[in-house]
């Protein structure tokens, strides 16, 4: 009688120490997993699993290169990036490539080079993935003992963790080196409306860097998302990179403590769940960063933040009505509060009207007009520069609002405003991805814990509905 499932299906998250175990093929009979279970069929085949991961990396890098070139081909220098639906070129521009004063794009060749390099890299990764999936040894340690691992081997797993941490730390230092030595990065706070500059005076004070982590996430505090100068951002990368590298070396040289051996589940599916949980946190954090932060994600490339667009509208109409003779310091609105200017609960002078809720916005085009107690009336009357007027009028009409059918802008505008902000796309996508990764974390964590406790049996293959259905062919 044909066996529809293997007993090894019942210990699917554990790898046996018996290295003589024959793993014949990649079908349901020999692995206990059907074709749609994906890489689960390769749990015990380290060579094939390596091929799957390398090929997956190739697909990711191919998308990056192809999408990069697609955006270069469609880019028009006469419009800002955020009006053109771009999500990759803004990242390259933020790193200081091809950008001039004020965020103007003066050279697209670096973007073309980036796309080509990613395509070439994806070809190398794709070849490596195909080689390891089809031609290389199924179990890699049979040919290369150095790469032998068993999911239950706690010491080997923490060594692999350490290697990953060192690589992540080196990645963080790549940004540091770019900012310090290789041309600098784009600083939206540079005088006169932003420019590329080298970062010379890093913030390395632990009280400042780790103070961000201890801040409240609410209101004007904003947790780490409140960072608003590049010295802090690059200094933070020095700290993160150093901690990752030191932590990686520590994990390579040490063995897990007894409490860690007891508290954690040591299986392939458990490691998957830990990774998904970490990625979920990354996704939610990136969502908040791209939505609220206009230093790491300059508005010149990503469009204004929601609060920024709102404050820009108040500023634009203050400029207009002041020219028409309005006394912006004394005019009252329909509620009796200041029409153009009012005081915040802490006594600062802020913009009046509905935008009062965004009174703690900080933006490069607005900060020069502040004094010690908020907005300075004398500066508003005498010091407003043309570039500030132009930028606020532009941001006012490009709020990061709108739906997927590209009817964007603010609610008072006509439907012809065909615009969805990259901030909307990036924040929404990272929130959704973060959420689904969190669900995946819970799912795989539950399965891993159940398997470790000995009562997870998976789907009963004897009574699977698909087995009683007519074959597709």
UniProtKB/Swiss-Prot annotation:
The gene is psbC. It comes from Cuscuta obtusiflora (Peruvian dodder). Pfam families: PSII. SUPFAM superfamilies: Photosystem II antenna protein-like. One of its GO terms (molecular function) is electron transporter, transferring electrons within the cyclic electron transport pathway of photosynthesis activity. The keyword Secreted does not apply. It is found in: Plastid membrane. This is Photosystem II CP43 reaction center protein. Residues 1-14 form a propeptide.
